[in-house]
Amino acid sequence: MAMNNTSAASACPVADRDDRKSAEFTQKHLSPFAGSKIMRSFSGAREVLRSPNVRQGGSNSSEIVFDNPAHISFFFLDGEPHRKRRASVAAYFTPKAIITRYHPIISRTMAKLTAELQATGAGVLDEMALELASNVTVEILGIDDRNDPRALAKLLHAIRRASPRPNRSALQRFFQDRVFGWYFRAPRARLTKQFYDNHIAPAIEVRRKEPKDDVVSYMIKEGYSKAAMIMECMTYGTAGVSTTREFIGMAAWHMFDRPELKQAFLDADEDGQFAILQEILRLDPVSGVIYRRADSAIPEADDGAIQAGDLVGIDIRAANQDEQTVGACPFAFDAERRTRTRNVANYMTFGDGPHRCPGSQVALHEGRMFLNCVMRVPGVRLAQEPTMLWNPNTQSYEIREMIIHCDKTS
């Protein structure tokens, strides 16, 4: 039975405890889209995300041209076209694919990274996480860039930062697209050309001769245009690399600051390790707000009536910490919480409904294996507190310069 907020607070034995690391930083920088209706309860968020009466409303979705939906990234599609396209990529994210295709890549990468860490006695954890996430992502894409996987990831990040900010006003679009269009488009165009020429085009040449079960092979088979290929690879690349990198950094930060949590993670079995990571993500989700546009009214929505045409923002952090759902002490770390509440352990961290992140399990496996390796390195410790940055395009935090030290091998 759900408890009200008053009883939940009084039931909390550590009412003043707050284990979140990004809450204050996010509150300072997060700027929901103008005119959006924000859903903060877990039930309200789930209701909207699962509703058939909404469609994608963020990430410049209003500026996407749907001349040929078959060649639009499935991230931007809704309804039956989205279901069909999502089914076509489901094989990349099955438990079998994770274990047989990605686990070997993760294991090889971690052996290399930990050997380098011990050889020098120091490393930058967020850069290590970037390399791992990049290696897995290029396998999914079919882009053979493992000689320098971080270069591709950094290029994708630069393209994303050079992109127009989401939900621009009409005046901003007028000046940025028409009056000074050449100025705003030039950096992105240059970087995008570099991405296609140096990464996608070589992969196309290889996959035409030797197709595999990956994104590039699929796009060749379906006759994607150059622009469509760039968009699809950008979507996979930014989602697969950026979020995983930040999640790993945040989880590591929690463990370095709390030795008992680190030890609990190392002592736990696989399921227990996943529970710890999911609870960290509940407290410090990478993404801030995800958006949906209502095609028709939802008059009985939990957080208030929604009218047709409304832009609705899902406050992931607030939903993840809704006492009605997560129980007492919503800001405190508790790996046993999911057992008591009987809710999906990730809550809203990876979204919900038809657009729930398809690669969430891949990210969790990457994070678990990365941290299980790094935290076992003799003498590993945090040498420098990381810097937190804010990405206005994705409305998410970024963790940088997380320097770690360890016992150096002779």
Predicted region positions:
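Cytochrome P450
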Residues: 2-410
